[in-house]
A protein has these predicted regions:
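A short, flexible loop at the N-terminus of ABC-type nucleotide-binding domains that lies
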Residues: 2-40
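The short alpha-helix immediately C-terminal to the Walker A/P-loop
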Residues: 47, 55-59, 208
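ABC ATPase nucleotide-binding domain signature region
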Residues: 61-111, 201-202
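Conserved ABC ATPase "signature" region
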Residues: 118-133
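Conserved ABC ATPase signature
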Residues: 137-144
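Hydrophobic anchor residue at the start of the ABC signature
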Residues: 151
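ABC-family nucleotide-binding domains
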Residues: 165, 171-172, 176
Length: 220
């Protein structure tokens, strides 16, 4: 008989943890005592319409501040500023960068993200068909092309935490295949986390799933 106790499966180490988070927007309570662990690799946040998927991404990005609760990065308490510094997130509805070109937008991110990968960006520009749009002001781009600009920035950023809302929306087939490939790479990372919000899991990707329901997060 072995002297060693039977091995037990251990949960992945959390890169980011949310504890007892309460978020209210106006008269609407979005989350009540929400607890969540985000491990390195790929995580899907899913749920019904208006369940809080986008709001959760904004919380994790430090773009929203909850009424109560706490966040921890690598086990260390993290305020909104720390979350912003660790993450890449862009609100796809924002017009804040509409007057500059995609190329200028990407160039401005290189100083913010020390692990910015210029070669990855070059590959993404080709894979997403952005070469002909790179020097146009963003307001001239279609919704799908603007989304590609954000996606290229996300995957090239080298951020510890990448947050993407509906990564396949408004994409052509070739671009969707490119995004799927990059998400597949993100799923294998042992040091970075990619969190996507969508209505269902993309086929063929190894990921963890978190269901949002009635203000709570449930591991699926």
């Amino acid at each position: 008989m072995s002297d060693h106790p039977p091995s037990q499966a251990t949960a992945p180490v959390a890169l980011l943890r949310a504890s007892a988070v309460h978020l209210r927007l106006g008269e609407h309570t979005v989350f009540t005592g929400l607890d969540l662990c985000i491990a390195p690799g790929l995580t899907l946040i899913y749920g019904d319409e208006s369940c809080g998927k986008s709001s959760l991404l904004r919380l994790l990005a430090g773009d929203l501040v909850p009424q109560s609760g706490a966040f921890f990065l690598d086990g260390v308490p993290a305020d909104a500023s720390a979350l912003r510094n660790a993450s890449y997130w862009t609100d796809i509805r924002s017009e804040a960068h509409d007057t500059i070109s995609a190329r200028s937008y990407w160039a401005g991110l290189q100083t913010r993200y020390p692990a910015w990968d210029a070669m990855a960006l070059q590959t993404l520009v080709g894979g997403l068909g952005l070469a002909e749009h790179a020097d146009k002001p963003l307001y001239m781009l279609s919704t799908g092309s603007k989304r590609k600009v954000w996606l290229a920035a996300a995957f090239a950023s080298g951020a510890r935490l990448i947050l993407i809302d509906e990564p396949f929306a408004a994409l052509d087939r070739a671009s969707a295949a490119c995004v799927r490939d990059w998400l597949g790479q993100a799923a294998k990372s042992a040091s970075r986390a990619c969190v996507i919000a969508d209505y269902q899991a993309p086929a063929g990707l190894a990921l963890r799933q978190v269901l949002l329901r009635q203000g709570q997060a449930h591991a699926a």
